[in-house]
UniProtKB/Swiss-Prot annotation:
Organism, as annotated: Burkholderia cenocepacia (strain HI2424)
Functional summary from the UniProt entry: Required for the insertion and/or proper folding and/or complex formation of integral membrane proteins into the membrane. Involved in integration of membrane proteins that insert both dependently and independently of the Sec translocase complex, as well as at least some lipoproteins. Aids folding of multispanning membrane proteins.
Residues passing through the membrane, by range: 7-24, 364-384, 434-454, 473-493, 508-528
Source organism, top-level taxon: Bacteria
Compartments where found: Cell inner membrane
Name recorded for this polypeptide: Membrane protein insertase YidC
Matching Pfam families: 60KD_IMP, YidC_periplas
Gene name of the encoded protein: yidC
Lineage, uppermost ranks: Bacteria, Pseudomonadati, Pseudomonadota, Betaproteobacteria, Burkholderiales
Protein family: Belongs to the OXA1/ALB3/YidC family. Type 1 subfamily.
């Protein structure tokens, strides 16, 4: 039996099953392996309030969208537009909520004049960041704030910061002034909550900071599954992803209290995260508040505030692309929102190396090519052993077929004869298998590196490839991949089974069809890898691994 071919068939079968499983999840069906990781089918997420679950305690659940209350408000809310070098956005004076945020340096990948909108409050999509007070009838995100010192709302000229402040009405003897600080070139927003006790008795409020999002799936490459949902990070339990489906069932498992870390909403390429001050005690919550609406947040108690006194609660809000080096400098563990899945331990060093190569060549496409060359060079000894074994197996294939034909009625004698042939010719049937198996985790890791890296968005390579995160517009790379797979197949030993031989010829067609829909960066990697493999195999089999044929 050809062990290497069997291993390849197992890999092919597992790949097909995993691709089908991704298709299941992308269409809102349960995963065959991880039932809790199902993509919830996209649905309109309006602003109707839901019933607050016990997880978030008394955090108000209303005002999730543009129409938060069925009762006509006493004051009319407005949308205050602002602009910096990295953001265009809107702050809703109802709650002083950050209701819209467009990333001006991240194109939408389809139209050159449009950009990625992260936070939004349209009829079909809700994603926002908001804060408020608990512990009494204090101002929260349902109350209409007033903009203080209205004036310039744009970061212009030589200014490095833009501050926008909003004041709440007095409720429960408390007034809140919320200030957003935007810094040039930064995706980190400073959020300062000043609590003034204008009453006659001490107050002990709790500040809540939360991210609210519907379960509308973001667009990802076909046959590829990336995480969408809340996440929590603490020093004790590190990175904890929370599936929407677990929140649906009230079965989410995550750390509920800490004095460090952050909470986030994660999607493909982009994330947002509340980062409270380190050392400040806080409770952590995540819950479903509407049929299609979820939230994750923290509740941070404030020490008693005497009449006439005030307290400041400072936090940071990250909202932007999942650029690994940038995230590492913002908060511990924040780079983990860039989801490599179970291959993180290998993927992170690979991305580091890819990034270093890009620093020299200045083009992500050529960086992928050079990284693939480097990996093939590192694994050359293993590949040489594999191809030598394949070359020897190919040389003795006619003799193996003759033995199978001679002893086809007696499987035991056939196996004994084959083993004797292997021993005589010093051929290890497992010799071509182990080197391939060892390399598989590295190639899978590189796949996830290229799939998860926002740096590929809008990154050109050459000529017709203008965006490595999008599929090849002319399908040139998938065709080249199919051709390279056919060439590889022709270099391998011919399977003795005619049916198996036909299936091996069909594999390049099946894989090339799938790769027609893969991002160009991924296909580029596989094409280069195949071409290098062909060159290695040809060189080794012709120059190093040749064996003279012997009669059966």
């Amino acid at each position: 039996m050809d062990i290497k071919r069997t291993v390849l068939w197992v890999i092919f079968f597992m790949s097909a099953v995993m691709l089908y499983d991704n298709w299941q999840r992308d269409h809102g069906r349960p995963s065959m392996f991880f039932p809790s990781a199902t993509h919830t089918a996209p649905a309109a997420a309006g602003g109707a309030s839901g019933t607050s679950a016990t997880t978030a305690g008394d955090v108000p659940a209303a005002a999730a969208g543009a129409a938060p209350s069925t009762t006509a408000p006493a004051a009319q809310a407005q949308l205050v537009k602002f602009s910096t070098d990295v953001y265009d956005g809107e702050i809703d004076t109802r709650g002083g909520t950050l209701a819209k945020l467009t990333l001006k340096k991240q194109g939408d990948g389809k139209q050159p004049d449009l950009y990625i909108t992260l936070f939004d409050h349209t009829a079909g999509h809700t994603y926002l960041a908001r804060t408020g007070l608990l512990g009494g009838d204090f101002p929260n995100h349902n109350d209409v704030y007033t903009q203080l010192n209205p004036g310039s709302t744009s970061l212009t000229g030589d200014e490095n910061t833009l501050k926008l402040s909003f004041e709440s009405p007095v409720k429960g003897g408390v007034k809140v002034v919320k200030t957003y600080t935007f810094t040039r070139g930064s995706y980190v927003i400073g959020v300062d909550t000043k609590i003034d006790n204008v009453g006659t008795a001490p107050v002990t409020p709790t500040v809540y900071m939360e991210l609210v999002r519907d379960n509308t799936a973001v667009e990802t490459p076909m046959f590829s599954h990336t995480f969408l949902g809340p996440a929590v990070y603490t020093d004790a339990k590190h990175f904890q992803k929370i599936d929407f489906s677990d929140l649906d069932k009230n079965k989410a498992n995550f750390e509920k209290s800490s004095d460090n870390g952050w909470v986030a909403m994660v999607q493909h390429y982009f994330a947002s995260a509340w980062i409270p001050q380190q050392g400040a005690k806080r409770d952590i919550y995540a819950e479903k508040i509407d049929p299609t609406l979820y939230r994750v947040g923290v509740k941070q108690p404030v020490a008693a505030i005497a009449p006439g006194q005030s307290a400041d609660v400072q936090a940071r809000l990250f909202a932007g692309p999942e650029e690994e080096r940038m995230l590492e400098g913002i908060a511990p563990g924040l780079e983990l929102v860039k989801d490599y899945g179970w291959v993180t331990i290998i993927a992170k060093p690979l991305f580091w190396l890819l990034e270093k190569i890009h620093g020299y060549v200045g083009n992500w496409g050529w960086a992928i090519v050079l990284l693939t060359v480097l990996i093939k060079a590192v694994f050359f000894p293993l590949s040489a052993a594999s191809y030598k074994s394949m070359a020897r197996m190919k040389e003795i294939t006619p003799r193996m077929q003759a033995l199978r034909e001679r002893f086809k009625s007696d499987p035991q004698k056939m196996n004994a004869a084959l083993m004797e042939l292997y021993k005589t010719e010093k051929v290890n049937p497992f010799g071509g298998c182990l080197p391939v198996v060892i390399q598989i985790p590295v190639f899978i890791s590189l796949y996830w590196v290229l799939l998860a890296s926002v740096e590929m968005r809008g990154a050109p390579w050459i000529l017709w490839i203008h965006d490595l995160s999008q599929r090849d517009p002319f399908f040139i790379l998938p065709v080249l991949m199919a051709v390279s797979m056919f060439v590889q197949t022709s270099l391998n030993p011919t399977p003795p089974d005619p049916v198996q031989a036909k299936m091996m010829k069909f594999m390049p067609i099946a894989f090339s069809v799938m790769f027609f829909f893969f991002p160009a960066g991924l296909v580029l990697y596989y094409v280069v890898n195949n071409v290098l493999s062909i060159a290695q195999q040809y060189y080794i089999t012709r120059k190093l691994g040749g064996v003279k044929k012997k009669p059966a």
